[in-house]
Amino acid sequence: MTISPPEREAKKVKIVVDRNPVATNFEKWAKPGHFSRTLSKGPTTTTWIWNLHADAHDFDTQTSDLEEISRKVFSAHFGQLGIIFIWLSGMYFHGARFSNYEAWLTDPTHIKPSAQVVWPIVGQEILNADVGGGFQGLQITSGFFQLWRASGITSELQLYTTAIGGLVMAAAMFFAGWFHYHKAAPKLEWFQNVESMLNHHLAGLLGLGSLAWAGHQIHVSLPINKLLDAGVDPKEIPLPHEFLFNPELMAQLYPSFAKGLAPFFTLDWAQYSDFLTFQGGLNPVTGGLWLTDTVHHHLAIAVLFLVAGHQYRTNWGIGSSLKEILEAHKGPFTGEGHKGLYEILTTSWHAQLAINLALFGSLSIIVSHHMYAMPPYPYLATDYGTQLSLFTHHMWIGGFCIVGAGAHAGIFMVRDYDPTNNYNNLLDRVLRHRDAMISHLNWVCIFLGFHSFGLYIHNDTMSALGRPQDMFSDTAIQLQPVFAQWVQNTHFLAPGFTAPNALASTSPSWGGDVVAVGGKVAMMPISLGTADFMVHHIHAFTIHVTVLILLKGVLYARSSRLIPDKANLGFRFPCDGPGRGGTCQVSAWDHVFLGLFWMYNSISIVIFHFSWKMQSDVWGTVSANGVSHITGGNFAQSANTINGWLRDFLWAQSSQVIQSYGSALSAYGLIFLGAHFVWAFSLMFLFSGRGYWQELIESIVWAHNKLKVAPAIQPRALSITQGRAVGVAHYLLGGIATTWSFFLARILAVG
């Protein structure tokens, strides 16, 4: 008879939380900087307020205990979710209280979405445009109306109840944030239990989340949208619960519902093909993806993620161990391979965050490129303002996330990287090859820059000399993007070959016929030519320069030939101390700062390209005589010179925002003006020296002393790093708001 030792018995139930670790205490709220010994003493100079902002969320500097840092981050995530739910609730509330949603639902091709009405204080009611259907309000471009229709929302009452649900969820999130920091805080081992986390996130969030959405779409969205598409008045459509509990009602729309679950259990799944389709392309009634296709997609995704959520080994001895996977990952030329990466990713949340930001940023950019080619919601494709806004929004979000990845990778290198644990693994080998990588990348940037820009300069010169036959264009020296055209054609032909079950290709942008809704183009084949080939290489150039700056910042964050002990100076420092000239702007932080400007360049050119290309070659009206595009196909003729971009895009299309005064678009004119000012204001911070301001401040303080009104808190010029941070923030804010007002005034006027 064997008696198992007592410790094995006790291990069955793991206690992975600490009870009541931190008392709830509101007194800290009244003490700014309570987390830092220096800051909590209060301000002696104006630098205090800047340091307070810089360090308030930098949990690493407040404690070195990884468990405490993890708990703070975890708790802060719940707070973030609470804020998101409040924002969402506000959106739904505006839809319920201040919008023309019910009118839009009856005629989405003529009535424009609006969910905000400006109060008449001193003439502001000029901003309320006539959006159709007798409604005066601001035209919105967020895409919520289209999303709500796809969800099967048919009344403002439903929006009200959802808004209340959002507030309930927000309250639950705020409570959870408090509870899991003050009452039951997870232990470090819980945060480091990656297999359980993967299983729960994959199976729970992504698997069950997709399954729940697929279920909602099948039982609520599909029947309601089918009736809406057929022209049934929203007030006549049965309520969601009637479809849920009345199979006969569903069977009238989708006959397979009469058979119940029998086909599912007998594996005769083809019976369900009336609501799980594989049509491809767009619904000609709404200009959006077939909702039966998107249901099929979410059901398939749910199955994949539910399987994926059972792959990792936890309490039962089956499944993969992430540490084993990583350590087995060795190639013939990669030394120790991924050995040591498991330890990095379970002890450095900056490393983890850097990877997640890079992937999520890339995903956001992929989303923006899919949403115009395959508009997921009904009547989204013909709402040009919303299409342009969604593309621009997801591009910006992606750009910021990718720069954030560079930032947190740099912080990881400075604060968390331990060379002794990373001998000859992939990270160590990348660091040892960094000179070869950066110099090659630098060569690529120079090559792309000179060649892509050189094509434009050549064309501008030939154009100025009156020699169009010597220009690179579709009518003279052609540089056709043959590979892109081949990819387009391959996708267009896919239903016959690689996707035999699909009835059409994924998007009309590959080729085929124009999809028009209410006389407006939803999507049509996008022809690519010399002008696209040229701007594509400008995209390649700006993206490679952004990567060069960010990657150099990460790879040289700890040391360089110039400053071998850089790691000791920290993540951000202005220069390597007195007596070492030429060592300024070398910190990892400064690389993020510089990377932001090139990210701005990259994204600007992408959204300008998109805006002009769509107006020239896709968006427009359809009549018996064919398609009439907004700018009449001028992209191919004009976008191959710099002068063409300046004259026929920026200048020609800014007339709407410049002449918006006195119309409902006048707010965009004011934003355009104000944002230019904010942008120009940034240059004062970016081009000036700290000493200049310190001298000025001291003369102003002298004047105050003369008048005996000297302040108790001593004024100080911004530090070099603070000045740069303020500068780049205003540069980006000004640039983004300028672009936003320029785009919207233009597209709302002509689209």
From Swiss-Prot:
Residue stretches in coiled coil: none
Residue numbers binding phylloquinone: W693
EC number: 1.97.1.12
Catalytically driven reaction(s): reduced [plastocyanin] + hnu + oxidized [2Fe-2S]-[ferredoxin] = oxidized [plastocyanin] + reduced [2Fe-2S]-[ferredoxin]
Keywords: 4Fe-4S, Chlorophyll, Chloroplast, Chromophore, Electron transport, Iron, Iron-sulfur, Magnesium, Membrane, Metal-binding, Oxidoreductase, Photosynthesis, Photosystem I, Plastid, Thylakoid, Transmembrane, Transmembrane helix, Transport
Gene Ontology cellular component annotations, sorted alphabetically: chloroplast thylakoid membrane; photosystem I
Cofactor binding description: P700 is a chlorophyll a/chlorophyll a' dimer, A0 is one or more chlorophyll a, A1 is one or both phylloquinones and FX is a shared 4Fe-4S iron-sulfur center.
PROSITE patterns named among the record's database cross-references: PHOTOSYSTEM_I_PSAAB
Any one Pfam family match given in the protein's UniProt record, by short name: PsaA_PsaB
Keyword Oxidoreductase: yes
Family annotation (InterPro entries): PSI_PsaA, PSI_PsaA/B, PSI_PsaA/B_CS, PSI_PsaA/B_sf
Subcellular location: Plastid, Chloroplast thylakoid membrane
Binding-site positions, chlorophyll a': H676
Membrane topology summary: Multi-pass membrane protein
KW Electron transport (keyword) present: yes
Binding annotation for [4Fe-4S] cluster: C575, C584
Binding site for chlorophyll a: M684, Y692
Membrane-crossing residue ranges in chain numbering: 73-96, 159-182, 198-222, 294-312, 349-372, 388-414, 436-458, 533-551, 591-612, 665-687, 725-745
Subunit (UniProt): The PsaA/B heterodimer binds the P700 chlorophyll special pair and subsequent electron acceptors. PSI consists of a core antenna complex that captures photons, and an electron transfer chain that converts photonic excitation into a charge separation. The eukaryotic PSI reaction center is composed of at least 11 subunits.
Entry similarity comment: Belongs to the PsaA/PsaB family.
Function: PsaA and PsaB bind P700, the primary electron donor of photosystem I (PSI), as well as the electron acceptors A0, A1 and FX. PSI is a plastocyanin/cytochrome c6-ferredoxin oxidoreductase, converting photonic excitation into a charge separation, which transfers an electron from the donor P700 chlorophyll pair to the spectroscopically characterized acceptors A0, A1, FX, FA and FB in turn. Oxidized P700 is reduced on the lumenal side of the thylakoid membrane by plastocyanin or cytochrome c6.
The protein's name: Photosystem I P700 chlorophyll a apoprotein A1
Source organism per UniProt: Chlorella vulgaris
